[in-house]
Amino acid sequence: ILGVSVMTLSRHLNQLQHRVGTSLLTRHSKGMQLTNEGSRLVEYLERAEAEIEAAGSIFEARGQSVSGTVRIAAPEGFALKVLTPNLATLLREHPDLNVEIVPQTLGFSLSRREADIAVMVGHPNEGQLHSELLGTYDLGLYASESYVTAYGMPTTIDELLNHRLIGYVEDLLFSERLNIARQVASEWVSNLAIYSPIGQVEAVRAGLGIGVLHEFLLDHDEGLVSVLPELRFSREFFLVSHPTTARVPRIQAMLTF
């Protein structure tokens, strides 16, 4: 990608670390990761890149498309049901723009430059990030009509806990804000645990149990019925970016589309 060999890149990195007098990267089982000092240096470099690109854009012909790659980290449901279907207009306007959509995994950090932009559930708790409220979404308990016919409809939380329950694989959750099931009942134990909210919708639709589902994923599915409808939950989506890169044309195009 950089047009240089690994050996050359390693040599330049070692020279840079020697010059600044500290380690900028650490090695681990999955590759390399920026140290705190490395992240601070990247902030300065990205600010310089943003200023250079912004200055260059002054001389670009009006209407000229931006180019390059923007990486967006987003929850699966938002990425597949909201973001992806709305990209056509943006990419038609900027045909030289490439977009990478990646999942938010446990330990994800936008501050460590793991993505250019992130869509997060709840306000980010990392400093030095710009955030903007995108909107809210609702969640509720649902079962399939076939499940209710076979096993009955719970009318209390105690009755609910005696049913087959569907939820997340809890130790893979990148945010506790997603663990709505524990808000329903601290004793909640998922008989079927699925990492994917879309997978949970499909499992409930198949009659495998009762789950807390994102309502924007349901598409007014007539095969599902609300369980304990008085239990409603809301969460917020925030658009989060690095202040130092917001003026880079390709990132600005994505932030404003």
Residue ranges and their predicted role:
Residues 5, 12, 86:
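Residues within the DNA-recognition helix of helix-turn-helix
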Residues 17-34:
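A short LG(V/I)-centered, amphipathic sequence patch enriched
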Residues 112, 124-237:
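C-terminal regulatory
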